[in-house]
UniProtKB/Swiss-Prot annotation:
Keyword Ribosomal protein belongs to the record: yes
Stored PROSITE patterns: RIBOSOMAL_L14
Assembly with partners or alone: Part of the 50S ribosomal subunit. Forms a cluster with proteins L3 and L19. In the 70S ribosome, L14 and L19 interact and together make contacts with the 16S rRNA in bridges B5 and B8.
BP-aspect Gene Ontology terms: translation
Keywords: Ribonucleoprotein, Ribosomal protein, RNA-binding, rRNA-binding
Pfam families on file: Ribosomal_L14
Gene name linked to the record: rplN
Similarity remark: Belongs to the universal ribosomal protein uL14 family.
One of the record's GO molecular function terms: structural constituent of ribosome
Function: Binds to 23S rRNA. Forms part of two intersubunit bridges in the 70S ribosome.
Organism: Geobacillus thermodenitrificans (strain NG80-2)
Name of protein: Large ribosomal subunit protein uL14
Highest classification ranks of the organism: Bacteria, Bacillati, Bacillota, Bacilli, Bacillales
InterPro entries per the UniProt record, alphabetical: Ribosomal_uL14, Ribosomal_uL14_bac-type, Ribosomal_uL14_CS, Ribosomal_uL14_sf
GO CC annotations, alphabetized: cytosolic large ribosomal subunit
Length: 122
């Protein structure tokens, strides 16, 4: 479960490698984030020369979780890691490439640009 102080791998080429969650957006006192939820995070590890620098505060959408999510047909989808994609305020990604699979639940939450850039949608 992703909450405050959780560390997420960054699944794009924005320059960040790892982020730490500061806040889960959506409602007062909301504790946990799942796939498709937006979080405010700070960059803990970054590649040199990237768009995003270490220490920067960014918004990110969760694209993979170890806990997984239940689908309407009763099946569960879960991944090997917790990962996110750094986004702008208009829900478009800051990077130009997405690495690894993303969940189909992002389509329901209008992250169509991330869906189109992803190599695999599960």
């Amino acid at each position: 479960m992703i909450q405050q102080e959780s560390r997420l791998k960054v699944a794009d080429n924005s320059g960040a490698r790892e982020v730490l969650v500061i806040k889960v957006l959506g409602g007062s006192g909301r504790r946990y984030a799942n796939i498709g939820d937006v979080v405010v995070a700070t960059v803990k590890d970054a590649t040199p020369g990237g768009v995003v620098k270490k220490g920067q505060v960014v918004k990110a959408v969760v694209v993979r979780t170890k806990r997984g999510v239940r689908r309407s047909d009763g099946s569960y989808i879960r991944f090997d890691e917790n990962a996110c994609v750094i986004i702008r305020d208009d829900k478009s990604p800051r990077g130009t490439r997405i690495f690894g699979p993303v969940a189909r639940e992002l389509r329901d939450k209008d992250f169509m640009k991330i869906i189109s850039l992803a190599p695999e949608v599960i």
